[in-house]
Amino acid sequence: MSQQLQSRRLRQPIVVVLGHVDHGKTTLLDKIRGTAVVKKEPGEMTQEVGASFVPTSVIEKIAEPLKKTFPIKLEIPGLLFIDTPGHELFSNLRRRGGSVADIAILVVDVVEGFQKQTYESLEILRSRKVPFLVAANKIDRIPGWKPIDTYSFLESIKSQRKDVQTQLDNYVYRLVGQLAELGFNADRFDRIRDFTKTVAIVPVSAKTGEGIAELLALLAGLTQNYMKTKLRFAEGPAKGVILEVKELQGLGYTIDVIIYDGILKKNDTIIIGGLNGPIVTKVRSILVPKPLQDIKVVKTDLTQIDEVYAAAGVKIYAPELENALAGSPLFVAENEQQIEEYKKIIQEEIASVKYYNANIAGIVVKADSLGSLEAIVEGLKQKNIPIRLADIGPITKKDITEAELTLQEAKEYGIIAAFRVKPLQGIEVPNNIKLIYSEIIYQLIDDIEKYITEVRESEKRRTLDSLILPGKFRLIPGYVFRRSDPVIVGVEVLGGIIRPKFPVMKKDGKRVGEILQIQDNKKSVDRATKGMEVAVSIKGNIMVGRQIDEGEILYTDVPKEDLEILLTKYKDIITDDMKEVIKEIINIKRVNDPTYALGLKV
C-alpha cells in the first residue's frame, strides 16, 4: 500500500454529469463506463460504490487516435464518475464554499439546444464554482450524419459531408450564443487556445461513442493541468461527503460516501451529520462491489476492504447510522480534540442550511438530505418565494402548525413542500394546507411557483369580482327602450368597464341608480368594455328625460376603498382608457370629498 501511495502524487478528479431531462446524461455515462470495461485489462478497474472509476490506461487507449492533437502525459490515476446524473445527487456533493466535484459535463442535445434544466444546471454549477465542459450530444441525429466506427469526433467529422459539417457548426454556434448570453465564452474544443478563459464544447454521440475520446482526454487534461493543487494527494485522515443513506437487508443502515481527501481505514472514528446533530461512530466495514467483468452486471455483491484512499466511492457500515444525513460532511478524527472540532464544523454546516423565522409568512420546506434542502432553498430564493421553515426529515405536527400560521397571513404561502419525505406515521396534513411532493428538485420548485400563481390569480379574481371598477358610458340618443322602473337604454362604453350591480353617478357626482343587467345582441353578458355598444337596465328612482337624458355621459360610482385596492394591488389590469376614467372620477368625487384617492398614484 505504501508503495502505491508513494506513486500517487495526484488523486483522480471527481466528475459529475448534469443537463436537461432526455438529453442523454445516463446514456453518456453508460457509454463511458461500457467503453472503459471493453478497453480495460483484467484487474485494472477498481470497483466503487455510487461512482465509476476509469483508469488512465483506459483513457489513453480510447484516446489513442488523438496522440498528436493532445500530446499530454497523464499523471492522474484516472477519472471518477459519479454514477447518478442530475441535480438531486449532485446537490449532496456539497462542501463548504463549493462542491466535492472537480469538474462537470453539461450534457446538451445539440439539435434542441439549451432547455429549462440546462439553465438550472448552469446556475448550480456557477453557484458551487464547479468548472464544466459541454457535451453537445446526439450528433447522430443531425440529418445526413454517417456514424463511423471510432471514439474520436475529429476522425468522424472528416468523413461527414460538407453540408452536415455546416449544420453541426450552426448547432454549435447556437450553443456558443446561449452560453454567451449567460456570460460564458465558449467554442468547439478544437478551436480553443486558452482553456482557462473558454468553455469547451465537445460534439459527441452517446449512442455511437463518437466524441468519447475527446471528452475523456479533455476531462483528464484540463483537470491535471489546471487543478494540480486541488488534486494533490494527502496521506492523512479521510474527508468525504455522504451521497446516500441506505438500509441493507441483514446488515442495517449504511452510508454511501465519496472520499475526496486522505485515507479511510477500518475502525476509524468518523464524525457525520445526523438528523438530531453530529454523530460520532466507528467504521465497522468498508464495502465495495466485487470485481466485474461486464458493466451490465448489477453492483450488488459487496466485499470488505481494510482501507481506501481518495478519490473513491465506498459503502460504510457503522453503528448509529439510521439518522445519518445525506449531503453531510464525513471526517475521520484521530483524537478527542479533533472530534470536538469536527462536531462543531458539522453543527455549523447543518445550521447554515436549516432555517426558521416565525416573523415571515412563507412556505415550509422539508427534504431528505442536507444537499437537496440547500438546493431547494437556493432555488426558492432566486424565485423570491419566502420561506418560514426549512428542515430535514419527515413532516411533523410543528410543520403543519407553522404552515397554518402562514395561511392566516398569506393564503398563497400555506404550503408544505416535501422533497422525498412523507408525514410521520399518524400525522395527516389538513386539506387547507397545500402539500406539494416531488422527487425532482426543479419539479418541486415549478409546482410551488405554479400553485402560488394559481392562488394569487384566484384571489385576484375574487377580489376584482367584489370591487366596483371605474367605467364611463354614454346614453345613445334614439335608443331608449324603457324610460323608467327600470330604465332600459342603449349605451356606448367610452372607457373602463361596466358590470351588473355597479352603482352609477352623473358628472356632478349624484348617484342615479345601479346597473341591473347588460345585454349584447340580446344575450346577457357580465361586463362591457371600451368600444362596446350594449343595452343596459338601470334600477333607481329615475326617468329618462328628467333625472337623466339621451346623450348624457354617466360614470360608475367607485367607493374610495375599492379604488385604493385597485391602485395598490391590481395596477396591472388598469388599461390606458381606464386610467383616464379614474382621473375623471377622482375630479368628480373630490368636489364633495377632498380626501378621495388622496396619496394614491394613478
UniProtKB/Swiss-Prot annotation:
It comes from the Archaea. Keywords: GTP-binding, Initiation factor, Nucleotide-binding, Protein biosynthesis. Residues 205-207 are annotated as: G5. Residues 83-86 are annotated as: G3. It holds the Pfam family IF-2. PROSITE patterns: G_TR_2. Belongs to the TRAFAC class translation factor GTPase superfamily. Classic translation factor GTPase family. IF-2 subfamily. This is Probable translation initiation factor IF-2. It comes from Sulfurisphaera tokodaii (strain DSM 16993 / JCM 10545 / NBRC 100140 / 7). The lineage of its organism: Archaea, Thermoproteota, Thermoprotei, Sulfolobales, Sulfolobaceae. The gene is infB.
